[in-house]
């Protein structure tokens, strides 16, 4: 591979002085609202992407103006937990320093801001820092935000799992001081030897993004098998004893390029809790050294495992960790949804899960979600937990405070919505107008689409059945559409590829059923299938399993061979 020309990003990273580039100079320039092409790649490591309003792109071009550039900043919040005080700071930033005046909960248990002008970036990062929050490594070719099941029922086990997720996040952060120097005005230290700057990542970091999740069975809301590296908690007598390790998952693909495909992770075996950091670092460094740095479309860990082989990869990980895998332990992987409403934990505290459609927290007529969460944060004594289904848990509520919290939630439209089983299990990415990769709508259209799905389920008498439905504006897969029982992936404005056949639990991918079709065709197809499902399903059979059993689509067993075939 050394004889081949590397991907451009590899040269950018090498020459960036550990992610500094010319970001500071670009930030100081008032000539444009943009950064240079090279710095646009480097700023991802600092937690944000350059975007523009695509709804206004043609109009501004006609006016001979540059695109209306803005930035999306994503925070690093391992496990999705923040304090009410932190949330008040997060809310204030959204209300005063962004044009969207909203907060977007993501599918990886954090939040992001849209519509940030370049001049406000530094202020926002400094304001986040005052709340002990940051955006380091929220994007870029590094370990991203580490997910962990909120699981507020098993509080003790959750806290143990969360501690591991937090440790993973902290241990695998980049060591460069570029973030602190550029955004927090820290003085630059004298240059040191390369290997001491980034002992794990090295000068070129990873070949591509790297995603981790910690799952606490039976819940699988973190979609553990869709991650590069997963840790499935194993408990004995309610105490965490270790994890089943999974590796090689990832959703992204490219339309029309069969060498790219989504993939679910492989099971590698059981590891003890004290060995988690050894194995995490081992998997990451194998990917660092073996991953494809020539073709970024084939650079995720899933392709490294496919190209080198499972056994070879496993042996190298064991060698670097200095520990061998034990046989995986039996665990039950179940529901990927959230528990809406009040749930009592084993510690006697109560937890209120609020449905936030597509994760968008914004004040609208009759539904003042942002104000509601702000008012709750002012009085709440527990914490806020963001879920990977883009929802919010008001966690750790004392019994005597329940009525007050619930009253505020109802007053501001955070409770009381008509929520079907399917809507509660469905998510969408942002897509248009801000995402530069989007080929079709997702977040703005998704609520209307789910209305149609709800109506079809009611028509056929299957409203009680939860169906996992996900929509993205492109095949990069941010809302994990290839692990949905019904997946819609944007192909062109108003057109989507329809995927069917994933398992309800997230242990099998779906497969394309129809390509490049419009809403009417999608709904007609689902109308027919829902009719069959209502009559022909076995007792307890989920929709995804049904579509495979009756031959609507073939089961994807080996994604490298089956997904496109």
Swiss-Prot record:
One of its GO terms (molecular function) is heme binding. The keyword Metal-binding applies. Its cofactor is siroheme; [4Fe-4S] cluster. PROSITE patterns: NIR_SIR. GO terms for cellular component: sulfite reductase complex (NADPH). It catalyses: hydrogen sulfide + 3 NADP(+) + 3 H2O = sulfite + 3 NADPH + 4 H(+). Its EC number is 1.8.1.2. Siroheme binds at residue 478. InterPro entries: CysI, NiRdtase/SiRdtase_haem-b_fer, Nit/Sulf_reduc_fer-like_dom_sf, NO2/SO3_Rdtase_4Fe4S_dom, NO2/SO3_Rdtase_4Fe4S_prot, NO2/SO3_Rdtase_4Fe4S_sf, NO2/SO3_Rdtase_FeS/sirohaem_BS. [4Fe-4S] cluster binds at residues 429, 435, 474, 478. Belongs to the nitrite and sulfite reductase 4Fe-4S domain family. Alpha(8)-beta(8). The alpha component is a flavoprotein, the beta component is a hemoprotein. NCBIfam families: CysI (TIGR02041), PRK13504.1 (NF010029). Component of the sulfite reductase complex that catalyzes the 6-electron reduction of sulfite to sulfide. This is one of several activities required for the biosynthesis of L-cysteine from sulfate. This is Sulfite reductase [NADPH] hemoprotein beta-component. It comes from Shewanella baltica (strain OS155 / ATCC BAA-1091).
């Amino acid at each position: 591979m050394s004889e081949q020309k590397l991907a451009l990003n590899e040269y950018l990273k090498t020459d960036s002085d550990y992610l500094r580039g010319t970001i500071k100079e670009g930030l100081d320039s008032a000539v444009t609202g943009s950064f240079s092409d090279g710095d646009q790649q480097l700023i991802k490591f600092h937690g944000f992407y350059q975007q523009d309003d695509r709804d206004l792109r043609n109009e501004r071009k006609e006016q001979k103006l540059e695109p209306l550039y803005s930035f999306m900043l994503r925070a690093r919040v391992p496990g999705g937990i923040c304090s009410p005080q932190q949330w008040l700071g997060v809310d204030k930033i959204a209300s005063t320093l962004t044009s969207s005046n909203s907060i977007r909960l993501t599918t990886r248990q954090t939040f992001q801001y849209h519509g940030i002008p370049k001049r406000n970036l530094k202020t926002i990062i400094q304001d986040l820092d005052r709340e002990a929050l940051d955006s380091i490594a929220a994007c870029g070719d590094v370990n991203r935000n580490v997910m962990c099941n909120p699981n507020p029922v098993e509080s003790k086990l959750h806290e143990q799992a969360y501690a591991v997720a937090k440790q993973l996040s902290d241990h695998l952060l980049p060591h460069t001081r570029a973030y602190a120097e550029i955004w927090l005005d820290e003085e630059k230290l004298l240059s040191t030897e390369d290997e001491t700057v980034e002992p794990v990542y090295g000068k070129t970091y990873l070949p591509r993004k790297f995603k981790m999740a910690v799952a606490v069975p039976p819940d699988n809301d973190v979609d553990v098998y869709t991650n590069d590296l997963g840790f499935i908690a194993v408990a004995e007598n309610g105490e965490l004893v270790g994890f089943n390790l999974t590796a090689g998952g990832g959703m992204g693909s490219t339309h029309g390029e069969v060498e790219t495909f989504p993939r679910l992770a492989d099971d590698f075996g059981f590891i003890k809790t004290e060995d988690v950091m050894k194995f995490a670092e081992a998997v990451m460094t194998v990917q660092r050294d073996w991953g494809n740095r020539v073709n970024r479309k084939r650079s995720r860990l899933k392709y490294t495992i496919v190209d080198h082989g499972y056994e070879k990869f496993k042996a190298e990980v064991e060698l670097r960790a200095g520990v061998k895998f034990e046989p995986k332990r039996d665990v039950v992987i179940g529901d990927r949804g959230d528990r809406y409403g009040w749930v009592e934990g084993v510690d006697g505290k109560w937890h209120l899960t609020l449905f936030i459609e597509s994760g968008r927290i914004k004040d609208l007529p009759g539904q003042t979600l942002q104000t509601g969460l702000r008012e709750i944060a002012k009085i709440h004594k527990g914490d806020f937990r963001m879920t990977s289904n883009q929802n919010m848990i008001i966690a750790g509520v004392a019994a005597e405070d329940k009525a007050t919290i619930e009253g505020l939630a109802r007053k501001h439209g955070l409770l009381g919505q008509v929520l079907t089983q399917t809507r509660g299990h469905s998510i969408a990415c942002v897509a248009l107008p801000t995402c530069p990769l989007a080929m079709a709508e997702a977040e703005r259209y998704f609520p209307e689409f789910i209305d149609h799905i709800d109506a079809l389920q009611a028509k056929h008498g299957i409203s009680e059945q939860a169906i996992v439905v996900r929509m993205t504006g492109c095949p990069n897969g941010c809302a994990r559409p290839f692990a949905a029982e019904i997946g819609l992936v944007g192909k062109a404005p108003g057109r989507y590829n329809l995927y069917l056949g994933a398992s309800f639990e997230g242990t099998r991918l779906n497969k394309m059923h129809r390509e490049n079709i419009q809403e009417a065709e999608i709904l007609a197809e689902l109308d027919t299938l829902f009719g069959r499902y209502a009559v022909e399903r076995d007792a307890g059979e989920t929709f995804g399993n049904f579509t495979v059993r009756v031959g609507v689509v073939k089961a994807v067993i080996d994604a490298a061979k089956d997904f496109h075939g």
